[in-house]
Each structure stands twice: as structure tokens, then as C-alpha cells.
Amino acid sequence: MAAVRGLRVSVKAGGGAEPEPMEVEEGEVEAAADRASPREVVSGSNRRYENRAGTFITGIDVTSKEAIEKKEQRAKRFHFRAEVSDQQRNVVLDREMIRKAIPKVRLETLYVYGVDDMSTEDIFAFFKQYPPGYIEWLDDSSCNVVWLDEVTPSRALLNLSSMPTNEKGQRKKDGEHSSARSKKDRLDDSPLSSGDETEEGEVEEDNPSEAEDEDETETEKKSVNPPDTLSEAEQASLLKNELRPSSKPVKGNSLYMRFATKDDKKELGAARRSQYYMKYGNPNYGGMKGILSNSWKRRYHSRRLQRDVIKKSTFIGDDVEITPTYKHLHSGLVNVPEEPIEEEEEEEEEEEDMDEDDRVVVEYRDELQAFKREREGARRSAASNSDSDEMDYDLELKMISTPSPKKSMKMTMYADEVESQLKTIRNSMRSDSVGNSVKSRIGSKSHAEKPADVRLILEEKRQSTASRQQSSSGKSDVRQRLGKRPHSPEIRKTLSIAPTSRREPLSDVHSRLGLPKQLEGKGLYSDSKEKKTGSLWNRLGTAPKDKERPSEKSEKSPAAPEEEDSVLQQAWGALIKEKEQIRQKKSRLDNLPSLQIEISRESSSGSDTDS
């Protein structure tokens, strides 16, 4: 397809059909002219239509003062008086000033407007006095006329056009005055002794005396014709780059021209909107008139591509004496007539813009399949004939000249397909094994198990602690009231049984034990039988009321099962405080004198049963 994109189309001006006024499609560029010039390098999107009649370049600025003086001197030496034309004016333009006044100006190009129903040859005929190099068509109504120098366009602009309508009368007056003055000056002889200079074709005078007399008479007249000057209004109009109407109409059209700029370019899609092609025919598509559908354009490009390939194949076949027997990719279009095809009845698809690839090469699915089968058959035949040393030129030509399809299928072997299937199976098995290993490491819970509510768990703990407190409060343990000694065997047990029991600070041990005052002076260690026979509760006394409060709280706790979680936190805080208090009590009891209270286990067990 890359080879097709670079295809160039050249249309001859004298091919029977009228030359087209502009580019057909974007992306197609005509072959460059033989006489290449740096000034011909313009925008690549504009197509050039050269002047087949030829152009002319003087090489000098004929409007300069030096050129005018030399021209007058030659006319004087040869006694030649040229006919003065009123339309021709020798005006000197300051091109540097024009470049500064008009941005992006192209002094070698004139922009011409109003060329409707005019062909390329008609425009060249209008400028035949100043033959241009080529034309760049912009649309049906305008074009750019390009010269190969910067002097000729300015002369053509001034001599073939006039001032705008509002200043046309003033320009005519100035023109008449300047032309009359030029006529008068041209009749005078030159006083300069320029006869010493000799040029080719010059003839020396036989009578020098007569020549001297003529020189003396010439000194009294002015022979040098000064260049014409523009009026201020006309000069201002040129600097503004206003459209100047042509001096004479062409085919009933009034042309307007000015200096072209770099912004005067062909718009995209102008060929599809061209009314000239619809009326006079499109030479780039066989001279077809009317609206051309996209399908017709595709078939035309395919047929043209087929002809080019056949020409190349016949050229190679003549050299190697081998006649090509294969068919091209678009072989289904062989029977299409070379004459213009009639328009098909289609919907408004011709109004839609075509992509660049669709304009050049269009692929057909049926032909693509046939092309693939044809290639496979050619490869098999080439493999069968591989034992011969001769080259298969037919196959080589076919491979080179046939464009590759836009979307070519990737050829794979059966082993590659099997390997890809095995890879997919391995990847799927690997993903399953990885998932199972992760589950085994983490450990997954059974679906039957449901996460229990945290509130229910806290409620169960609260009820269990309440039941324990209630059971422990029923037994008023003597050891809790007496205080805990380091040598007591059941210290840890009592701590776990009654965690919420609070004790009175051990300020007075005797008052807690309930000893009589008369025994205080005798000492604590008396062997009297009255102490042993007395009731344990009489000697110990009753427990204070403060110690019974925890039991009441423990009884009320199960009655309020709907308390918040803060109650459990308070219980834990109380337990920590109790541990701290127990530690302090131990330290205090250790500092006091040792109390040897002999209490038998039987009496303690009996007291428990009595309570």
C-alpha cells in the first residue's frame, strides 16, 4: 500500500479534455517540471498546471532606470522609434516597501478571483503578454498565477488591471498625463555621447559629419524617458493589497487580482465540491461528469493500479522471455470497460468525505480470501519446482508487484496453536493450586460456623461472674475478714472466688477480732479455756456493714443483664484496685506484731455450716 500511496498522476493539457482547474484529491502531487527552479517550491498541497506554451524571463528589471536608459540609447543608435502603447507603463515599484506593508506576500505570484467557467488555457491566454510559469487552482472561482521572477508579476498587475472603482477616474487622468509626457519625451534625442559604445548588430555611419550634426541637435532635446510614477492613491492601494479589476473582461467574467500571500491555499475537500468538474467533467476520473460515488472512484483506482502492474509485468517478461500468466489482486475488475462508467444509484454517500486510504486502495473481503489461496498455491508450486536451478520470475514478480493487504492474517503452525493451548491450561492449573495453598496456610472457616455477636459473649461472661459472686457471698469466709497472711494456704483461691469484696482498712486489729478490753492488758496469748470454749462469732464479732455491700451489689448484678459494656470494664478496674489494696494490707500486717490465732479446721468448717 505504501507503493500505491506514492503513485503520481500527470494530466496533459492537450489531451482532448479541458484542463482541470484544481487538485482532485488531497495527497496526489503532479510530477515536478523539467526546469526546476527554487521559486517553484511552494505548498505541497497545491497542484501545479504548467504553461505548455513556455514562459519567458528577461533576467533584468526592465522597469529600472538603467534598463530604460539603455533601451533609449539603442533606439537612438539604430534610428528606431518603437510604437508607444498607452497601456504599457514603466513603473518602478519598491519591493522592499511592499514586503514590509503586506505580511507573507509572494511577489512572484498574483491572486486572481472571478475565474468561474474558465479553464487553465483561458487564464494563460489572458496573461500571454506576460507568460507565467504555472497556475495553482484554489477553488472554482480563484487561483494563483505564478511567475519565475518578481518583476513580471508587478508589470502584469499594473498594466492588466486598474484602480478600484472609487479611484478609477483619478487613475485614468494620471495615466493619460503620464502617457502624453512619455510620448513627448520619446521624440527627443539623447545629448549624451553614448555613441562610443558599440554593440552587436550596430552599423557605423559612413558620413561622420552628419553624425556630428545630429549629435549637436540631440543636445537640445531630452532623449531619456524617465519611468512613470504612480499617484499617491494608487500607491496606497497597492500597499493595502486591494483587489484591482481587470482592464478587459474574459468570457464575460470580470477578473480581480492582487499580490498573493502564503495564506492563499487550497481548502480541503475543494475537489469534491467543485461545480466545474460536475459541469465539464473530471479528467482525473476519465472525464466523468456529475457526482461521482465513492464506489465508482474505488473501481477506477483499482483499474488504474491493475494497468500499472500489467505494464511492469510485461516489461519484465520481455526481458526474460517469460509471459506472465497470473492474475492480479483485483482480477475481478478485468472486464470493467475502459470508458467512463455510468453513475450507480446510491444514497448520499458521495457527500461524505473519504479517508486517504479509501481513495487509493480499497480491499474487498472476497478478493482477499482468493488472494490468500492463490499465494498458498503459488508457494506449493514453487516448493515442488525447487529442484530446478531456474528462477521463478513469475512468482517473484507477483510477490513484488502485488500490494500487501491492509489487515494481513498472521500465519501460524499447528504446533504453535497446540503450545498456546497448553500454556493456557498450565496457567489455569497454576492459579488454582496457588489459591488452594493460600487457603491451607491461612485456614478457612467452615460455612456452618457463623461469627457470634460480641454482645452475646460479653453477656455470658457477665452472667458467669455474677453467679460466682453470688455463690461466694453466701459463704462469709472468716479468712476474708481476718485478712490474708503470707502463710495462708488459700490466698489465691479466695482472690478468685471474691474478686469484688472490699475490706475495711486495718486500723485496729483488736476491734476487728472482738477481744474484750480486760484481755488487752494481759496480752493476746492467754491459755484460758474461756477463749476456746467461747463462740467464735462472739470473739470475732460481726462483720461491718461496709463488707456486706459487695454482696448486695453482686445480688443486684444478675438483675440487670442489659447493662452496657462499661460495667464489665468497671469490674476489671475494681479487681485491679483490690489487688493493689491486698498488697498494701499484706505490707501492713507484716509490720504489726504477729498474731497467733489457733483456729482449728473443724471449728472453721463448723462456723461455715452454722452460717
UniProtKB/Swiss-Prot annotation:
Residues 423-439 have a biased composition (Polar residues). The keyword Transcription regulation does not apply. GO terms for molecular function: mRNA binding; RNA 7-methylguanosine cap binding. Residues 20-31, 196-218, 339-358 have a biased composition (Acidic residues). Its main location: nucleus. InterPro entries: NCBP3. Signal peptide: none annotated. Residues 464-475, 602-611 have a biased composition (Low complexity). Residues 168-179, 446-463, 501-511, 544-556 have a biased composition (Basic and acidic residues). It comes from the Eukaryota. It is found in: Nucleus; Cytoplasm. Residues 1-44, 159-230, 338-360, 373-393, 423-568, 583-611 are annotated as: Disordered. Keywords: Cytoplasm, mRNA capping, mRNA processing, mRNA transport, Nucleus, RNA-binding, Transport. A motif (WLDD motif) lies at residues 137-140. Residues 108-169 are annotated as: RNA recognition motif (RRM) domain. Component of an alternative cap-binding complex (CBC) composed of NCBP1/CBP80 and NCBP3. Associates with NCBP1/CBP80 to form an alternative cap-binding complex (CBC) which plays a key role in mRNA export. NCBP3 serves as adapter protein linking the capped RNAs (m7GpppG-capped RNA) to NCBP1/CBP80. Unlike the conventional CBC with NCBP2 which binds both small nuclear RNA (snRNA) and messenger (mRNA) and is involved in their export from the nucleus, the alternative CBC with NCBP3 does not bind snRNA and associates only with mRNA thereby playing a role in only mRNA export. PANTHER family: NUCLEAR CAP-BINDING PROTEIN SUBUNIT 3. Belongs to the NCBP3 family. This is Nuclear cap-binding protein subunit 3. It comes from Xenopus tropicalis (Western clawed frog).
